[in-house]
A protein has these predicted regions:
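Predominantly the C-terminal beta-signal and adjacent terminal strand-loop region
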Residues: 75, 85-129
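Outer-membrane beta-barrel translocator domains and adjoining extracellular loop/strand segments
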Residues: 30-42, 72-80, 112-119
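Repeated loop/turn-to-beta-strand initiation elements of outer-membrane beta-barrel proteins
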Residues: 5-7, 14-23, 54-61, 95-103
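Residues that define the transmembrane beta-barrel architecture of outer-membrane proteins
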Residues: 3-5, 39-45, 81-87, 118-122
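Extended oligomerization regions of viral-like shell subunits
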Residues: 13-15, 24-26, 32, 38-54, ...
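C-terminal hydrophobic structural anchor segments
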Residues: 50-99
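Transmembrane beta-strands of outer-membrane beta-barrel pores
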Residues: 27-33, 53, 65-71, 107-111, ...
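Residues on the lipid-exposed face of transmembrane beta-strands in outer-membrane beta-barrel proteins
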Residues: 7-11, 27, 47-51, 89-93, ...
Length: 130
């Protein structure tokens, strides 16, 4: 059995194409009863910034940073001191009215609560509308 709470908020400027970004924030908290790994509480957070119409109309640039939900309290044993961290950056643009292209890079340090678990990746998403 567990209880989970999440809080999300965002703000968007009235005018796009400005240096002022859209801002998204969030935090999560979870508590467990009788978790098989003896975790009794965990928490995580994220912050995202996005800019619209900065280079051309209908494009988006964004970054996101955060910590995935990690154990903050254990019922027995030792709590890990490792602080995992994740990030992402992307640029989305429309070469024409029916295609959207979004290249992105992402990574993380100390994923899975281990100092040896760093990750890095890139992807390209293309959306076609007919």
């Amino acid at each position: 059995m567990y209880k989970r709470q999440a809080l999300r908020a965002y703000w968007r400027p009235e005018d796009s194409g400005t240096a002022m970004p859209e801002i998204s924030v969030g935090c999560d908290s979870i508590s467990f009863d009788n978790h098989p790994l003896n975790v009794s509480e965990g928490s995580g957070y994220f912050v995202g910034l996005g800019w619209q119409d900065m280079i051309q109309a209908d494009d988006r640039i964004g970054i996101a940073l955060g910590q995935p939900v990690k154990a903050t309290q254990v019922s027995t044993g030792t709590l890990s001191e490792v602080e995992p961290f994740l990030w992402e950056a992307y640029y989305s643009f429309k070469p024409n009215d029916s295609i959207t292209v979004t290249p992105a890079v992402w990574g993380g340090t100390d994923v899975e609560s281990s100092t040896d678990q760093d990750v890095f990746g890139a992807m390209l998403t293309t959306v076609f509308k007919f």
